[in-house]
Amino acid sequence: MHRRDLLKASAALALAGIYLPRPATGATSVTRDSATRLKTLGQAQPFDYAWLKGRARTMAQQAYKAQSGELPAKVAALDWDQYQAIGYRDDHALWANDKLRFQVKFFHLGLFFKQAVQIHEVRDGMARELAYDPEMFNYGKSGLKGADLPKDLGFAGFRVNFHTDLTRDITAFLGASYFRAVGGDWQYGLSARGLAIDTGMERPEEFPMFRDFWIERPAKDSSKLVVYALLDSPSVAGAYRFEIVPGATTAMDVDVALYPRKTIERLGIGPLTSMYQYGENDRRVANDWRPEIHDSDGLAMWTGSGEWIWRPLTNPANLRFNAYADNNPRGFGLLQRDRDFAHYQDDGVFYDRRPSLWVEPKSGWGKGSVQLVEIPTADETFDNIVAFWNPEEKPQPGQELLFGYRLHWGAKMPVTPNLATVIATRTGIGGVIGQKRTYFSWRFAIDFAGGDLALLGKKVVVKPVISTSHGTVEITSARPLDAIQGYRAMFDLKVPDDVKGPVNLRLYLETDGQPLSETWLYQWSPPADRSFG
């Protein structure tokens, strides 16, 4: 797994260093299961989603408890190279010998991953906890010896392989409530989380944790895998059901039941976490030889009223928080629209292959807002972008909150506008080339393609409709651009010297009062030095 994927999890494991207690289930003897050939703990117990919701509800009625504990010294001291040296033995994968389409392998504790999770297999409605076994791992040059490790050490998480290529992951659950998946390019990128709490606020963010997992044994020849998870944190307990179908676009149906322990100021449903260092539109820290560095380049939204919105991402000098009010949103996501290798020139991590992730609500979510948090970062090892849905009403203790949504991971999204979409945003100094500038202005060039743009006749007048929260717009245009079979909209923005904070911009293309494109939103901060002459 890529270095940055682990570092992003380290941020989510701010509460690391504790073990969660294993719930009492009667006998805890270790046996080897005759079907999976893996060691199990205790007796099989009845399991279904209704039971899991009941357990989460009961937990929420009790005070949150986290028992302190320490990893074995040698495990806690593992550095990056040592942790990477720990391999999983393929012959110990869950269902390795069962001729099913899925196999599951487990992550070892260590490095950033210091909290053990309990993992169960569900077969015919009965769940049995899988036991940690040093024989599952090849410790290589890690410096660890399996015989020296506690028999109840536990796992950090798990990853799933599919029969089309059992050497590569389709999804992984690792760290707090983080999980990720690939599409047809078999490339990890951005992550999702089970829940976000108080993200982007002045006080520390709370990171709920998936403390238990139940993985349902799939039917023979089934391409669907069902995973259940129990979420816990000081503010909330929750039950999750994931129905995972891999493919060119990997789909995950997610059902969520939340039971707050206390009032939650900022609840994030369907949270997405990504990285944006710099790109065509924002080159504040573009000091690398590569032209662009990002996992995602924009936030896409399909509002309840049917409007399509594209908000390019930025790497601001200071944390930015934006909320886009909506009622029953149809979808939102962090997308990687730019898929041209030449724009990245990275043949190691292949940013041009990073999946987009679209959140599709399965029922009405009511009033609230899609919220975007952009955090300054100096390099690509830190995930600095978060997007999620925030309900208008704050969750209260004693409530049951139910949400259902589908996650789509891949290069192509399940729905796209029938209008033209933004394919690039570029910015630079304004004014007229060759003429002396007498005041500071900033130019914006937005390229649109798709929809009906390529079909427009030469006499059709296309206009950019532009609005700004501060300053004035000048030198506006919208002209055909044959290279993209679309149009380029351009304008200069002049802002008064006393405007210091961000300026909100909005633009779309129209003809005869009819929209031709999605709506482009942008937030730009004027530089402190505007002494261009």
Label every model-predicted segment.
Residues 5-27:
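N-terminal export signals
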Residues 30-80, 87-89, 107, 343-533:
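Terminal accessory/anchoring regions of large secretory-pathway or extracellular enzymes
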Residues 62-201:
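Solvent-exposed N-terminal domain segments of exported/luminal and surface proteins
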Residues 116-123, 250-260, 404-407:
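Beta-strand cores of secreted/periplasmic/IMS beta-sandwich domains, seen most often
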Residues 123, 134, 229-233, 246, ...:
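A mature extracytoplasmic/lumenal domain signature
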Residues 229-278:
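Acidic, contiguous internal or C-terminal segments within carbohydrate-active enzymes
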